[in-house]
Amino acid sequence: MSLTKQAKPLNEKQQRFVLSHIGDTRDAIRNRVMFLLSIDAGLRAKEIASVEWRMVLDAEGNLTDAIRLENKSAKGSSGGVVYMSERLKSALADLLAVSKPISTIVKTKSGKPFSAASMTNWFWLLYRDLGFEGCSSHSGRRTAITKWARTISQHNGSMRDVQALARHSSLQMTQRYVEVSEDAMKRVVG
């Protein structure tokens, strides 16, 4: 991703709007999972396209609290444990109830796995149709990382924890993802 033109993160109002819009789509359950894998788990388009049911289910077929993202599904060798929000886990449970838990979690309308390119295109079309200029498949990841950075200190964490959540090899890369908040700067100064 170019450092001069980053994908815009989504604010809370935009996130609610997307979730409402997705609820009215043909594949609402699947689409909700794809969106939440982006904004809650911070997955890249390639990772969303390739995450498999076996990465989120235990031996008995129950959902776990984390995605065990394999290196082959991640950028570079950045696989690892990706923790799930309650709303993502709930959305996955809804999808599991209407899906066969084999191979990839999200599939195209024809039942085939998404490619990284088709997943990227799905997000681009979603944001274009909603009029969200500057948003792309990476907007959800930037949204997640910015949220983590703003709230990690409330949980006795640090930016190194955010770096680990983002699965970045350097703290500098993680810092580039974090959106500046003028409101937060004003409040901290008093």
Predicted regions and their residues:
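Catalytic-site neighborhood detector that most strongly recognizes the C-terminal catalytic loop/helix
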Residues: 69, 73, 166-190
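C-terminal catalytic core of Y-nucleophile DNA break-rejoin enzymes
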Residues: 73-93, 103-125
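DNA breakage-rejoining catalytic core of tyrosine-based enzymes
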Residues: 1-16, 76-85, 101
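Basic, Lys/Arg- and aromatic-enriched nucleic-acid-binding interface segment
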Residues: 2, 12-41
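Alpha-helix N-cap/helix-start motif at helix boundaries, enriched for small hydrophobics
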Residues: 34, 46-51, 162
